[in-house]
């Protein structure tokens, strides 16, 4: 990845095998690590409407006590498991509202558990007052962002562009992307 010019990877709502973090430590790759979300996801509420700048709600229904406990215990175990990996410089609690609940209290709890890392309470939208950074996702329109307050501003997701190249496709029947390009030149020009 470094040979391609990348110095940071975001592990999006999943954990990797130990070897991944070891190699990132060894080669100096920065990791933004999401906690694994456990909660309801609604495409319209959590993705479609916020992507174009709207919101149906700023708070989500509280998950069951079992789900809340699972998120808390799994998050604590994740922090203990990954604590000695210096490649991880930032943790994200919730992505785009997926399973988001009790954000301020959870931010304070996990930040107290590991104050050595930067904490992103909500990546994308449904932001809270408690977070070390302001995280934005931009898929349509220009990549213009405006800081709110004094927190660092991060663009943590963008683009969604695709170009189906022969010999570089996993699924030959479907192509995913918000904006699709038919040639390498057209694709590179859009970036």
Q: Which ranges hold each PLM region?
A:
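N-terminal carbohydrate-binding accessory modules
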Residues: 1-2, 22
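Phosphate-binding active sites in nucleotide-utilizing proteins
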Residues: 5
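Substrate-binding/catalytic cleft of secreted carbohydrate-active enzymes
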Residues: 8-191
């Amino acid at each position: 990845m470094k040979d391609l010019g990348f110095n940071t990877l975001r592990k999006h709502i999943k954990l990797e095998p130990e070897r991944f973090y070891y190699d990132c430590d060894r080669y100096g790759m920065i990791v933004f690590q999401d906690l694994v979300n456990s909660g309801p996801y609604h495409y319209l509420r959590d993705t479609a409407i916020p992507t174009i700048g709207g919101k149906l709600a700023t708070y989500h229904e509280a998950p069951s006590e079992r789900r809340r406990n699972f998120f808390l215990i799994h998050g604590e175990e994740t922090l203990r498991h990954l604590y000695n990996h210096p490649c991880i410089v930032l943790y994200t609690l919730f992505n785009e509202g997926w399973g988001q609940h009790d954000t301020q209290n959870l931010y304070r709890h996990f930040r107290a558990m590991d104050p050595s890392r930067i904490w992103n309470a909500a990546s994308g939208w449904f932001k809270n007052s408690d977070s070390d950074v302001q995280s934005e996702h931009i898929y349509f329109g220009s990549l213009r962002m405006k800081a709110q307050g004094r927190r660092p501003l991060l663009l943590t997701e963008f683009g969604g562009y695709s170009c189906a190249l022969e010999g570089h496709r996993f699924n030959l029947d479907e192509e995913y992307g918000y904006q699709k390009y038919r040639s390498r030149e057209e694709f590179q020009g859009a970036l």
